[in-house]
């Protein structure tokens, strides 16, 4: 063998050795040690624990919100369950008041009927009061569009504009919620 061939043969194993060394170094760099793996797992575990803790807090808050909403809905249902029924009874109160207004107070023959209607109306209004149904009678008060419905406006001298001068139909509230607005005649400037 010539010197050149010997040099080439010697050079090849050295190249392989360098390549093997680089591959081994790369393998060592790629393969983390047990401590590094443990550290990575601990970091990942800490992240998962934090995410679970946050999810737990959100879930507890959601449960609390659902519970509060359910309690509020139950209270609301109890408070306003009578709204439709009360609305139907308002016409009874209106008719009793109209009946009283139609009877002649001076006629002795109708005195018994008048007293009967008055007692019936009083009994109905007392029942309304027991269930927090309040009557709105805004005679001589300023007009309030949240509680009153203006049926007409009439120019009236010596009366402040936007004052209720006549109540055509009384309004009612159930636990502070308007069931029916008072239907009124309102004054306007002449």
From Swiss-Prot:
Keyword Cytoplasm: yes
GO molecular function, one term: adenyl-nucleotide exchange factor activity
Localization, UniProt: Cytoplasm
CDD domains cross-referenced by the UniProt entry: GrpE (cd00446)
Function (record text): Participates actively in the response to hyperosmotic and heat shock by preventing the aggregation of stress-denatured proteins, in association with DnaK and GrpE. It is the nucleotide exchange factor for DnaK and may function as a thermosensor. Unfolded proteins bind initially to DnaJ; upon interaction with the DnaJ-bound protein, DnaK hydrolyzes its bound ATP, resulting in the formation of a stable complex. GrpE releases ADP from DnaK; ATP binding to DnaK triggers the release of the substrate protein, thus completing the reaction cycle.
HAMAP family per the UniProt record, alphabetical: GrpE
Assembly information from the UniProt record: Homodimer.
UniProt protein name: Protein GrpE
